[in-house]
């Protein structure tokens, strides 16, 4: 049963109708609360602890009911630090799940898991709120249209195209460029499509969250002069937050995105950085609640938790949510239960390679490991499909020959294989691209490359028309015309040196 947004914020009950409990036990972020007989709160109800600590500081902690233990006890997980809480403190049952502000008032603002603004720009209009726990849309409401979502990033659009209203995973270990790729996608999509985005920062670095906010202000995605004209809402539950906040912040972001889809009937982009931290927070909470761990120490409810989040991210007849999720891969092991469970829900995977990052090829997207259900001739067309397959075949052949080259050298290869290697190296470099958000690092202005331009460029390389150009001419350029211009400049420079 889907609940619609309400037009009033959840109010803590008045003194006469308050359902009061008392803290019986505190284990880190987990509280046991005793309620009067027959007054037990429901699962997922929000509880509020108000009072003062031993030095007189005001305490206001919101918790969420996770278990009913019997003997009039409930076990709840805190959404903020439990410092200063004591046994015997009063706990108020709000009688409803956590609800957060939704709609136009959220654009250009930063929120925490509770939907409270944390950007020092004053209060937010909370007349329209929505509970963070909802069921997924019914089958009859779903939209099954297949269409490509152009990103302007060559390697993505050609080899693993994104589906409009689909779910995309960015897989990679630490430091290979997941967050930079997400920032570039937000930038390109806001400029090219003019759509609304919601960014959920789940358990990532606070510094990155701050950088992203500043970047958005500079690029105009967040309009400081007129906040209402901004194109993005930000929801942060970063590394320093308790596991309860990190576990629920993804749902807060999703609830805001659902409102734009269902009520405003818009196409929305939902970015989650990082979905692994959502699983990790769930694992911490599961251990604190006393559940028996499953494979590799993860929670036994891993698939259920992931499914309840992912199934709400979908396209309906009203609008679509296209979700791009960064997935940290522990120890670069794709068979780890967290990334493996995520794989099952995705329409496309963009796998980032440490080998390519070490070569300085950015975005470090692996052309052979990245996949998409959209790369079919009936969806993308014969020309796109054939070009993508030939690029993959050439890259695969180069990969197979690398051992022979390392042992015997290039001269021992046949003429045909030498030509394949030369073209594969050009393709590898042409798959790199200067990003708008990385201009400060690369010194090169960012480039947005349309799909037709991308296909034309790779067809020219594969046809052999550009065999005479040096491979460094293809590195960090936009379309193929820039590569030929760069080759001419390199030739002029080399002549001047002589």
From Swiss-Prot:
SMART domains noted in UniProt: AAA (SM00382)
For this protein, the record's Pfam families field holds: ATP-synt_ab, ATP-synt_ab_N, ATP-synt_VA_C
Record carries keyword Nucleotide-binding: yes
EC number(s): the record gives 7.1.2.2
* GO cellular component annotations of the record: chloroplast thylakoid membrane; mitochondrion; proton-transporting ATP synthase complex
Share an example GO biological-process annotation for this protein. proton motive force-driven mitochondrial ATP synthesis
Give the protein's function.
Produces ATP from ADP in the presence of a proton gradient across the membrane. The catalytic sites are hosted primarily by the beta subunits.
Enzyme class, first EC level, given as a word: translocase
- Which residues of this UniProt protein bind ATP? 172-179
User: Does the record carry Coiled coil as a key word?
Assistant: no
UniProt lists the family membership as follows: Belongs to the ATPase alpha/beta chains family.
InterPro entries given for it? AAA+_ATPase, ATP-synt_VA_C, ATP_synth_F1_bsu, ATPase_a/bsu_AS, ATPase_alpha/beta_chains, ATPase_F1/V1/A1_a/bsu_N, ATPase_F1/V1/A1_a/bsu_N_sf, ATPase_F1/V1/A1_a/bsu_nucl-bd
Q: Which GO terms describe its molecular function?
A: ATP binding; ATP hydrolysis activity; proton-transporting ATP synthase activity, rotational mechanism
Task: Quote the subunit structure annotation.
Answer: F-type ATPases have 2 components, CF(1) - the catalytic core - and CF(0) - the membrane proton channel. CF(1) has five subunits: alpha(3), beta(3), gamma(1), delta(1), epsilon(1). CF(0) has four main subunits: a(1), b(1), b'(1) and c(9-12).
> How does the record classify its membrane topology?
Peripheral membrane protein
Its annotated compartments are: Plastid, Chloroplast thylakoid membrane
Reactions performed catalytically: ATP + H2O + 4 H(+)(in) = ADP + phosphate + 5 H(+)(out)
Under HAMAP family, the record lists:
ATP_synth_beta_bact
Matching entries from SUPFAM superfamilies are given as: C-terminal domain of alpha and beta subunits of F1 ATP synthase, N-terminal domain of alpha and beta subunits of F1 ATP synthase, P-loop containing nucleoside triphosphate hydrolases
**UniProtKB keywords:** ATP synthesis, ATP-binding, CF(1), Chloroplast, Hydrogen ion transport, Ion transport, Membrane, Nucleotide-binding, Plastid, Thylakoid, Translocase, Transport
What is this protein called in UniProt?
A: ATP synthase subunit beta, chloroplastic
Q: Which organism is it from?
A: Elaeis oleifera
């Amino acid at each position: 049963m889907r609940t619609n947004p309400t037009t009033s914020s959840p109010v803590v009950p008045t003194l006469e109708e308050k359902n009061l409990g008392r803290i019986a036990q505190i284990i880190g972020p987990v509280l046991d609360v005793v309620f009067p007989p027959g007054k037990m709160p429901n699962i997922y109800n929000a509880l509020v602890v108000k009072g003062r600590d031993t030095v007189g500081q005001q305490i206001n902690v919101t918790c969420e009911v996770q278990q009913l233990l019997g003997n009039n006890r409930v076990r709840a997980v805190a959404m903020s630090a439990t410092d200063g809480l004591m046994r015997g403190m009063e706990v108020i049952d709000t009688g409803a799940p956590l609800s957060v502000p939704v709609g136009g008032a959220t654009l250009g603002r930063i929120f925490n898991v509770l939907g409270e603004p944390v950007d020092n720009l004053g209060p937010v209009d909370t007349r329209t709120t929505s509970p963070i726990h909802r069921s997924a849309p019914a089958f009859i409401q779903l939209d099954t249209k297949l269409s490509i979502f152009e990103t302007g990033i060559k390697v993505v659009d050609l080899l693993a195209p994104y589906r409009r209203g689909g779910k995309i995973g960015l897989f990679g270990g630490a430091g290979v460029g997941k967050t930079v790729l997400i920032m570039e996608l937000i930038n390109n999509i806001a400029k090219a499509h003019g759509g609304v985005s919601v960014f959920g920062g789940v358990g990532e670095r606070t510094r990155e969250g701050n950088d992203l906010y500043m970047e958005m202000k500079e690029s105009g995605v967040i309009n400081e002069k007129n906040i209402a004209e901004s194109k993005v809402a930000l929801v942060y539950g970063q590394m320093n937050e308790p596991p309860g906040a990190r576990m629920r912040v993804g749902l807060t972001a999703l609830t805001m995105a659902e409102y734009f889809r269902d009520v405003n009937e818009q196409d929305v982009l939902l970015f989650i950085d990082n979905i692994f931290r959502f699983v990790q927070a769930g694992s911490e909470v599961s251990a604190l609640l006393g559940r028996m761990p499953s494979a590799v120490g993860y929670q036994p409810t891993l698939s259920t938790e992931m499914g309840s989040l992912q199934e709400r991210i979908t396209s309906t007849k009203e609008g679509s949510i296209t979700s791009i999720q960064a997935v940290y891969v522990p120890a670069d092991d794709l068979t780890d239960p967290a990334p493996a469970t995520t794989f099952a829900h995705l329409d496309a995977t963009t796998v980032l390679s440490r080998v390519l990052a070490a070569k300085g090829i950015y975005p470090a997207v692996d052309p052979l490991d990245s996949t998409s259900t959209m790369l079919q001739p009936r969806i993308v067309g014969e020309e796109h499909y054939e070009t993508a397959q030939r690029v993959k075949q050439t890259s695969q052949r180069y990969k197979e020959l690398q051992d022979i080259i390392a042992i015997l050298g290039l001269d021992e290869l046949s003429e045909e294989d030498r030509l394949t290697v030369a073209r594969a190296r050009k393709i590898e470099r042409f798959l790199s691209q200067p990003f708008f958000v990385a201009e400060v690092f690369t010194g090169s202005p960012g480039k947005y490359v349309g799909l037709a331009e991308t296909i034309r460029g790779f067809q020219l390389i594969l046809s052999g028309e550009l065999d005479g150009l040096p491979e460094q001419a293809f590195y960090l350029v936009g379309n193929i015309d820039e590569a030929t211009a760069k080759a001419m400049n390199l030739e002029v420079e080399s002549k001047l040196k002589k």
